[in-house]
Amino acid sequence: MTDTTTTTTTDANKLVLEKSANSSGLEVDLHPLVLINISDHFTRTKVQSNYQDNCRVIGVILGVQNGRNVEICNSFEMVYATVDKQLVLDIEYLRKKYEQLFPLYDLLGWYSTGSQVSKDDILLHKQISEHNESPLYLMLDTDSPKSKDLPVIIYESELHIVNDEPTTIFVKTPYKIQTGEAERIGVNHIAKVTPSGSEGSGLTSHLFTMHNAISMLNIRVKALSDYLQAVKEKRLPYEQNILRKASSLCNQLPTIDTHDFKKSYLQEYNDVLLVTYLASITKTSASLNDTIDKYLVSNEKQSKRRFYQ
């Protein structure tokens, strides 16, 4: 993460400088936990804003830096306000949360969602620069769910001379995904739930299909029940064919009112009650043991006071 002052003929409106290789030699490792946190942050904000199209989230990225090696391990959300049509970060909130929750991590930079860098990003980047001389900027594009490539771009800033004025320019930095054991398990679970290349969740699709099937079954059963009630009250004619089919349908239901079923059910029910009872006894014993320990410690302190007196 470096700020390099160079003279360039870059257009003043261009905020990103495309490069084929990383000129600074920075090696960035990105953990999936960061992407999961950002995705969760964006999803919650999107739902709370009633799915507005201009939804955007901002936060900071944390990790460890050792020379030119940077490992982005975690992230958290940022509180900000709009002052004179500009975003202003709550630096006091950043300082308190950073010191209390993540004392072992370095503040490496910040993140946001979007597809293009704007001038507001330059201003936010300068605010983060008060805590890190050359922070990284991670952008997650939430508008490209069908993209096969990971929609994540990491920028570092360089200071260029544009039209004889120093200008901050973002430069794309290559990165690689680094996963821990816990992250690997979580990512594998998500991959099983959401098939690759699909916008929806496999679990959601399954539940939606099941909901439709149960709703349809409920409608049909209610219609049959209403018909039988109407026949019973002699509001509809007595149709042998329909009643025969209804009786056949009821006979297809499994009959579980047997001695073996009741015995198995009662045995399992008693096992559950026994486990619950043992858990309650264990919890009570632990509480009693803790109370006894506190009493012994208190009694020992009082004995020492009387001895020294």
UniProtKB/Swiss-Prot annotation:
PROSITE patterns named in the record: MPN (PS50249)
Subcellular location: Cytoplasm; Nucleus; Cytoplasmic vesicle, Phagosome
Keywords, comma-separated and alphabetical: Cytoplasm, Cytoplasmic vesicle, Nucleus, Signalosome
Job description of the protein: Component of the COP9 signalosome complex (CSN), a complex involved in various cellular and developmental processes. The CSN complex is an essential regulator of the ubiquitin (Ubl) conjugation pathway by mediating the deneddylation of the cullin subunits of E3 ligase complexes, leading to modify the Ubl ligase activity.
Similarity field: Belongs to the peptidase M67A family. CSN6 subfamily.
Subunit structure: Component of the CSN complex. The holocomplex is comprised of 8 subunits csn1-8. In the complex, it probably interacts directly with csn2, csn5 and csn7.
Name used for this protein in its record: COP9 signalosome complex subunit 6
Organism of this sequence: Dictyostelium discoideum (Social amoeba)
Highest classification ranks of the organism: Eukaryota, Amoebozoa, Evosea, Eumycetozoa, Dictyostelia
Encoding gene, per UniProt annotation: csn6
